[in-house]
Amino acid sequence: MGMIESLAGVQDSFGEVQFTDFGLSGPEAFTLSRAAATGGENQELALDFFREYGDGVLLDMLQEKRANLPALAAEDLFSGMLQSRLGKMIVKRAGLKYQTPLQSLNDEQLLACVKIAKWFTLAVEGVMGFDSAQVTAGGVSTREFDARTLESTISPGLFVCGEVLDIDGDCGGFNLQWAW
């Protein structure tokens, strides 16, 4: 599922996340994890489940669904658009009853669903820890090395690479590239 995440206004990323029994996972969750681990308390993550659509377009889509399927229950408002449980979560956050027929929903209620689907917030409670890590941060600061040669600017003749340096690249093999 494509979406964009924003971690406390600090970092944005576009790609896939997975909802699991322990929280979010997937490539974009990994990409944002360093900011989450070092960002302190009271962080919030915002997900946009319809990045490719503006609010008005998404509202038009929901209004059309209401017009074409008036007897459909509100819990199915996002059917065919999102995974069922996720659609229900949006409807619940909007304060709607699951069994309310779409014909009973006004534009303001549909707009509330749009706003939540386009800015779905979750509290960041932490990261899984070292045993679950795919990459670790820490090491010698890259500021202490020539970016072209990886020679130490403090100890000439000393060259380092890989995980000795404080680099945690994006998902997709970028950390492996540094390790070689």
What do these predicted regions represent?
Residues 167-180:
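A conserved FAD-binding loop/helix module that cradles the flavin
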Residues 1-104:
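An anion/pyrophosphate-binding glycine-rich loop and adjacent beta-alpha core
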Residues 88-168:
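A glycine-rich dinucleotide-binding beta-alpha-beta segment and adjacent secondary-structure elements
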Residues 33-36, 148-149, 172-173:
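Residue-level detector of alpha-helical segments with a strong bias toward transmembrane helices
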Residues 13, 117, 179:
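Short strand-loop-helix active-site module centered on a catalytic nucleophile
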